[in-house]
Amino acid sequence: IVSAQKQGLIPVIIDTENSFSFQYAINMGFEAEPIYGDVEIEDVDEETGEVSVHTENRITHWDGNFIYFNNAILCEQFGDMDYSSGSKTKTKRKTAVIEDVAMCINTILDAQENGDIDQGLLFVWDSIGSIGSYKEYKAGKIGNAMWSAASISQAFNNIVNDRIPASRKVTSPYSNTLLYINKVWMNNTLNPTGPAVMETKGGKSMKYATRMEILMGGQLTAGIKRLTATSKGLNYSYAIQTK
């Protein structure tokens, strides 16, 4: 996101982990200005239990050449969407869902196409697997892996297979990128006699659409073996081979 700002791109931070630290990002070179406002702070008397309120001037939000969403902001903007019918409801959800993220990305891409945004975009989502689908929300069963996978495949198909790649054409005035972090789980069934294999939450539809993937271990299965070499009595692993 620091490099994106330096290149004239707008970072669109979608923080469904609710863990993004602006101060840490600023220390790394990210440009953002704190906006201060009066915030009511509760004080509790430990002896009497009496609650009093005082006002302090604190950071309420951040401003700059970026767009930021967390779960609360997603619900505020898209929480009235009923994704099963495509209509809007009278009340807003307080739980963000996978479809909200796709709606967010499509809305911003629409604004760019309509001329309301005149810069390229870097979408950064942290992370797939941190929120469930609309179907899970309605059923009260957050954590249904198959429903999440189906929702990601359907909601993001046009984004990752058309809208983002189309911006790479020379005829496109702006170049857009989607970077995402994917939560994982360990599958013990694929390699019964060896270490568990790392699998992505939310299925593999995003994995198949990804142009570049960075994996952090957990890939050794029964169908893979390490290629090693020995030099001066030391063994070195230099590649893996599929059987």
Feature roles, as predicted:
Residues 1-6:
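Walker A/P-loop NTP-binding motif
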Residues 146-243:
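Phosphate-binding/switch region of NTP-binding enzymes
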Residues 7-144:
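Conserved inter-motif catalytic segment of the P-loop NTP-binding fold
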